[in-house]
Regions:
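Extended, well-folded interaction surfaces typified by the phenylalanyl-tRNA synthetase beta subunit core
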Residues: 1-116, 255, 302-304, 314, ...
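Conserved alpha/beta core surface patches that mediate binding of polyanionic ligands
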Residues: 4-8, 59-64, 95-142, 224-240, ...
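Residue-level marker of positions within ordered structural domains that often coincide
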Residues: 11, 51-52, 87, 106-107, ...
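A generic local secondary-structure boundary/capping motif
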Residues: 70-71, 107-108, 128-131, 185, ...
Length: 336
């Protein structure tokens, strides 16, 4: 071969005798595409929140689909079989990411690492009859154990449903997206600790607490919270450039509201209703909740203007709108 002759001549002549020269062609920096930049932002956010990235095979066992109680009508039950699998535990292409990540968690727990926050960004494969399978890029998150190691001043709390929900909401905010989170019914999640994730009315994922009986199948004995999101919308619509505004010079006004709320009415729905009533409402939060004869929920609403100091009349008018809006909902009364 021509290159072999050149190499042999150079060896005989002596590599040290060949002068160093600058390449004739100009060096160009590779520009990352927009989607790769969104992925980097997504990963940076999760790492800054204390998550570690895991990478798994894109395979799973057929029994994993059965373990997670996926019904035949669900697209995630339509797996692509592998002709020559490395083992029966990896006999099909994965249709969702939970089984492999739960195995990662079990592996670490068995080695004494019990406080775990991990994520994986990878592809899932859905069978499409005689055609090539559909490939989707998904993001999977998992949290289990305590928030931190033991601390002399206080006992660290365990992760819960609201921790995984807060991470998903924070990710949406970082990417300039609006996720709508509603009560869900995934078969492998605990009742009342399960939610679906929507953008513009389209479901893109789920989050919640994995059922104890399913965790035991993977030798996990501690509560585990997970989420899985399809990334196509995120990559297309994620915002990379933000416009910052100055910290407001004018003081906030704070009002507290207490309502009796039926169990059937989601508190998140009430928070969204309050936020949408006025651009002067900058935050809404629940600061107290108790149940005696009825469930009582107390909200703290913060008002602020970037242009002027708010007058009492302005805040009082919005306050009355909040009361009128919420008391129109069936099952809600003002607590006096």
């Amino acid at each position: 071969e021509h290159m072999d002759i050149v190499e042999e001549v150079a060896r005989i002549y002596g590599y040290e005798n060949i002068p160093v020269t600058t390449p004739a062609s100009a060096m160009t920096q590779l520009k990352r595409g927009r989607k790769n930049r969104v992925i980097n932002v997504l990963k940076d956010f999760l790492v800054s929140a204390g998550f570690f990235e895991v990478i798994n095979f894109a395979f799973m066992g057929r029994k994993d689909i059965d373990n997670f109680l996926i019904p035949p009508s669900d697209s995630r039950s339509s797996s692509v079989s592998i002709i020559n699998p490395i083992s029966k535990d990896y006999g099909v292409m994965r249709t969702f990411m939970a089984p492999n990540v739960l195995k990662n968690i079990a592996y670490n727990i068995n080695r004494g690492i019990k406080n775990i926050k991990v994520f994986e960004l990878g592809k899932v494969f859905i069978s499409n009859n005689e055609n090539l399978p559909e490939e989707h890029l998904n993001l999977f998150l998992a949290m289990t154990g305590k928030e931190r190691e033991y601390f002399w001043r206080e006992q660290p709390g365990e992760y819960d449903f609201f921790d995984i929900k807060g991470i998903i909401e924070g990710l949406a905010e970082r990417l300039g997206l609006v996720f709508e989170i509603k009560a869900g019914k995934e078969p492998f999640l605990e009742n009342n600790r399960s939610a679906d994730i929507y953008i513009d009315g389209k479901k893109i994922g789920w989050l919640g607490e994995v059922r104890e009986d399913i965790l035991r199948l993977y030798e996990i004995e501690q509560k585990t919270y997970c989420a899985e999101i399809g990334c196509s919308v995120i990559l297309d619509r994620g915002v990379l450039d933000f416009q910052y505004r100055a910290i407001p010079r004018y003081p906030q006004a704070i009002r507290d509201f207490s309502f009796f709320v039926d169990e059937a009415v989601p508190v998140a729905r009430l928070i969204d209703s309050i936020k949408n009533l006025s651009p002067l409402i900058v935050s809404v939060g629940v600061f107290d909740m108790f149940k005696k004869d009825k469930r009582s929920v107390s909200f703290r609403v913060v008002f602020q203007s970037f242009e002027e100091t708010l007058r009492d009349e302005t805040v009082n008018a919005i306050q009355q709108k909040i009361i009128d809006e919420l008391t129109q909902i069936e099952g809600i009364t003002l607590r006096v």
